[in-house]
């Protein structure tokens, strides 16, 4: 899981090998210190530690009924394998972590060896994850049966991500590392952190510290720059790119708590209309002298902190009434006149373009939500994230932009395929919460695109908006269903068997709970997953 590009094996063959939790890594190619440390760390994380955790446990089962369970094979063990041989073919096997690096691998298991061939360490890391899923427990032994096995694998999309939103309900630093570990286990490679919104501002700004000091419930949940640098490195050690988002010009009410006046004050209008979640209407005040210097500083700090190639500047859901109904509207009109802006829509575009320019000036690629493209405000260097109107995806790529898609992958919704422009899509979804993973699995918005159009689609992101998730339910709400998104982004377009996916995802969930990285995630359906006993504490 996700299902590989090519798999060959002997169906129900008892021919098997055994291995122990002390199995060793054997790197046969040139690999410098950083390369070797990466491989050793990930081999221990993905193979050695999980096997140690599973010692003495029973094998995973789908059912008590043999007819519908996984193949029950009594393995005939021909040998005990003591090492996993890894060969890397690139002269630079550990390139800079960026979208488009080679993640392919070949994994072969025979009666006398386990071998992995990859171009880079990132491909080898994926192979470790696949190898772990081949290992089963039989008579207190770790075995791989149905030999020989050969798996050739590579991702369908370059960008396979998850957006998390700690600005609605906070998440602790440790949670982010568990999220990265879980993403790596399903071969995802991007973590997008939504660092600010109307409700709170969780990013530490050294230039404008009152943003987080006044704009956060508790400073213990502020994501400091030192932690985010550490997190970006932690992600790199798992092959996961970490990048941040500061949303502008809307969703910025929290900025005003630290720097009064930088957000246009339309609270009277919001209260008078009894608007639900009205704080989301407020937008930045262009007439305030602090507004644009703060944007400058934040884009620079984001660029420097994460060190990756991407900075998300938001741009979604701008309500022009947030300006027209504000107490500062006359000053805003004067600003518009000084800049030659004839409408509030043009003012929105001014903000969009300004934020992108700052990111480009810092040598990074801007990422924006679809509205920035839809209103003609996207720079050609900008990546467009299509989140609502999936019809825009084709328009985006035909206009020469790179795109990622999130429409149909909203993990805060029970009806993930419900399109705002077509109410008929909001009815034929599964009523059971757990089976909404099938709706996400069916979501493949590039199927109708031509080959040339698909070249501009980098991939996609699942989105976990945080209004109703915190540390108590995050993993269950998100990762119980993210496996469907992960397989859609990795596996071939022809891989469409939802029941097969559920069995494989359920087993991977069991493995991940056993190795302490997917704790709190419920099963996809009935199954048996024995967990290691924990020592009781007083």
Swiss-Prot record:
The gene is HEXA. Keywords: Glycoprotein, Glycosidase, Hydrolase, Secreted. The keyword Hydrolase applies. CDD domains: GH20_HexA_HexB-like (cd06562). It is found in: Cytoplasmic granule; Secreted. One of its GO terms (biological process) is N-glycan processing. It comes from Entamoeba histolytica (strain ATCC 30459 / HM-1:IMSS / ABRM). Heterodimer of one alpha subunit and one beta subunit. This is Beta-hexosaminidase subunit alpha.
């Amino acid at each position: 899981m996700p299902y590989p590009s090519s798999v060959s094996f002997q169906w129900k063959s008892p021919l098997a090998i055994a291995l122990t939790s002390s199995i060793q890594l054997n790197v046969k190619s040139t690999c410098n210190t950083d390369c070797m440390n990466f491989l050793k760390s990930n081999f221990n994380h993905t193979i050695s530690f999980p096997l140690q955790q599973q010692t003495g446990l029973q094998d995973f089962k789908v059912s008590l009924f043999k007819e519908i369970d996984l193949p029950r094979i009594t393995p005939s063990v021909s040998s005990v394998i003591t090492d996993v041989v890894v060969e890397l073919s690139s002269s630079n096997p550990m390139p800079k972590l960026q979208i488009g690096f080679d993640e392919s691998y070949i994994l072969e298991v025979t009666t006398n060896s386990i071998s992995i061939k990859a171009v880079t360490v990132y491909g080898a890391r994926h192979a470790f994850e696949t190898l772990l899923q081949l290992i089963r427990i039989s008579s207190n032994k770790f075995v791989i049966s149905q030999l020989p096995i050969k798996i050739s694998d590579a991702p369908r999309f370059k960008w396979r991500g998850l957006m998390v939103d700690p600005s609605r309900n906070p998440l602790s630093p440790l949670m982010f590392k568990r999220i990265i570990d879980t993403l790596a286990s399903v071969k995802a490679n991007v973590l997008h952190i939504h660092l600010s919104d109307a409700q709170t501002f969780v990013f530490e700004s050294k230039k404008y510290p009152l943003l987080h000091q006044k704009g956060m419930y508790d400073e213990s949940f502020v994501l400091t720059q030192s932690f985010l640098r550490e997190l970006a490195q932690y992600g790199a050690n798992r092959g996961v790119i970490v990048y941040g988002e500061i949303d502008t010009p809307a969703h910025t009410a929290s900025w005003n708590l630290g720097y009064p006046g930088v957000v246009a004050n339309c609270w009277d209008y919001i209260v008078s209309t009894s608007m639900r979640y009205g704080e989301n209407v407020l937008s930045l005040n262009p007439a305030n002298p602090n507004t644009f210097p703060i944007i400058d500083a934040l884009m620079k700090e984001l660029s420097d902190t994460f060190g990756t190639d991407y900075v998300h500047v938001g741009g979604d859901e701008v309500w022009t009434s947030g300006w027209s109904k504000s107490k500062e509207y006359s000053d805003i009109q004067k600003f518009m006149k000084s800049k030659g802006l004839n409408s509030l829509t043009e003012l929105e575009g001014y903000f969009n373009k300004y934020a992108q320019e700052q990111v480009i000036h810092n040598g990074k690629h801007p990422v924006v939500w679809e509205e920035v493209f839809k209103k003609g405000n996207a720079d050609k260097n900008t990546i467009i994230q299509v989140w609502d109107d999936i019809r825009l995806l084709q328009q985006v790529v035909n206009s020469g932009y790179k795109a990622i898609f999130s429409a149909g992958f909203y993990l805060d919704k029970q009806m993930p395929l419900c399109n705002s422009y077509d109410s008929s899509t909001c009815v034929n979804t599964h009523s059971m919460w757990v089976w909404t993973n099938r709706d996400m699995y069916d979501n493949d918005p590039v199927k109708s695109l031509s080959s040339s159009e698909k070249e501009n689609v980098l991939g996609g992101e699942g989105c976990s908006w945080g209004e109703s998730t915190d540390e108590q339910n995050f993993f269950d709400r998100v990762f119980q269903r993210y496996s469907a998104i992960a397989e859609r982004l990795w596996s071939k377009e022809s891989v469409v068997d939802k029941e097969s996916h559920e069995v494989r995802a359920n087993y991977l969930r069991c493995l991940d709970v056993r190795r302490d990285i997917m704790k709190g995630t419920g099963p996809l359906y009935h199954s048996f997953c024995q967990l290691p006993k924990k020592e009781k504490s007083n």
